[in-house]
From Swiss-Prot:
Record-given protein name: Doublesex- and mab-3-related transcription factor C2
Disordered: annotated segments: 1-38, 334-356
One Gene Ontology molecular-function label: sequence-specific DNA binding
Lineage top rank: taxon: Eukaryota
UniProt-listed InterPro entries: DM_DNA-bd (IPR001275), DM_DNA-bd_sf (IPR036407), DMRT (IPR026607), DMRT-C1/C2_C (IPR031577)
Entry keyword annotation includes Metal-binding: yes
DNA-binding region(s) in UniProt: 42-89
An example Gene Ontology biological process: sex differentiation
Alphabetical UniProt keywords: Differentiation, DNA-binding, Metal-binding, Nucleus, Sexual differentiation, Transcription, Transcription regulation, Zinc
Compartments, as annotated in UniProt: Nucleus
Family: Belongs to the DMRT family.
Tissue-specificity statement: Expressed in testis. Highly expressed in ovary.
Length: 370
């Protein structure tokens, strides 16, 4: 290569280098200036790939009635922003109304805003530097606090309320129910009614043969169940120990059961033949119904013996002349035409005890004294 050619190359390179250096700064300076000098463009046109400046383009937009998914999102965003603005304005108006009502009621004037320290932040209040202005107490007991961010005054204050201290709830006593306090006891059992056994007799009248040496002027009654029904006719008492009762020593009085036969209406046929202290016997003179009457009488005696709740006899019972008793001596003579007295075995002396009465149809009632 000639020296002249090398000198020309140097000159060309020297001439081109300043131009290149001048071009590079121009390209680097356009990049940061674009965001600063960029004017707002239409969002609808931008969604469709068209760049149009927003100034004077609101009525001339070609995609103003477009309903694609991108344009629908733009509409929803505008509606949300409009609702936020309306809510903020409503809160500001409500806060001003509450403040005016508090001042009219004579509340204390608002104090100067105080700076909240970082260590004195209460729970429930967001952290940060906000100006807290105490407000008058509301009727419900909550103390409203107005938080105003220091850098954003245009959004308006936010109204917060602190819950009041825990107060005891009003207690209403429950009215007493049907069951009172304490241990409940069931009501006492009532006395069962007396066992009633009715025996029908169809035979003519037969006189009664009592024990010898008994007084007919003594009557036996039931004090708890009231007096027995007064019926015309003769009444008789038979005293005989039941099977299974303790007899005891011979020198002590025997505890026996007394069978009282009370007749109602016309006198019926009845023949009582007392036996020894160890047994008792009822002799009936009726023919066809003798076995039936004996069976019913035996069932009545067993039921009376098993009865555990029977009334007690009182010794101070007034005598009744209508009763023909066999408990005392000096019995009356037999009526004319009758069979008379038939004493068999030694007399029995009853002791006070319980008694249960049985009504026997035309014959009357049977009472067992134990």
């Amino acid at each position: 290569m000639d020296p002249s050619e090398t000198a020309a190359l140097h000159h060309c390179s020297a001439d081109s280098s300043p131009a290149d250096e001048a071009r590079v700064p121009q390209s680097t300076e356009l990049i940061p200036r674009r965001p600063v000098s960029r004017s707002p463009t239409c969002a609808r046109c931008r969604n469709h790939g068209v760049t149009a400046h927003l100034k004077g383009h609101k009525r001339l937009c070609l995609f103003q009635a477009c309903e694609c998914h991108k344009c629908v999102l733009i509409l929803e965003r505008r509606r949300v922003m409009a609702a936020q603005v309306a809510l903020r304005r409503q809160q500001e108006a409500q806060l001003k109304r509450h403040l005016a009502q508090g001042l009219m009621k004579g509340a204390t004037p608002l104090k100067a805003p105080l700076r909240v320290k970082k260590g004195a932040i209460r729970p429930g209040i967001p952290s940060g530097k906000e100006n807290i202005a105490p407000q008058p107490q509301s009727p419900h007991g909550a103390v409203p606090l107005v938080l105003t961010p220091p850098g954003k005054e245009n959004y308006g204050p936010l109204l917060l309320s602190r819950p009041p201290e825990a107060l005891p709830l009003p207690w209403t006593p429950v009215p007493p129910g049907p069951w009172g306090p304490g241990h409940w006891l069931p009501p006492g059992l009532s006395m069962p009614p007396p066992v009633v056994c009715r025996l029908l007799c169809q035979e003519p009248a037969v006189p009664l043969h009592p024990f010898p040496g008994f007084d007919p002027g003594t009557s036996l009654r039931l004090p708890t169940h009231g007096t027995l029904p007064t019926c015309p006719g003769s009444r008789s008492v038979l005293t005989a120990p039941l099977s299974g009762e303790p007899q005891g020593p011979p020198n002590l009085p025997h505890t026996c059961s007394t069978l009282i036969l009370q007749s109602c209406g016309t006198p019926d046929s009845l023949l009582l033949q007392p036996q020894a202290p160890g047994a008792s016997c009822l002799a009936w003179t009726s023919g066809p119904s003798e076995r039936q009457l004996q069976r019913e009488a035996a069932e009545a005696l067993v039921g009376l013996k098993d009865s555990s709740q029977a009334p007690r006899l009182t010794p101070s019972v007034p005598p009744n002349p209508a009763w023909i008793s066999l408990l005392h001596p000096c019995g009356p003579p037999a009526p004319p035409g009758g069979r008379g007295f038939q004493p068999v075995g030694p007399p029995l002396r009853p002791s006070p005890g319980s008694s249960v009465s049985l009504h026997i149809g035309r014959l009357g009632s049977i009472s067992l004294l134990s």
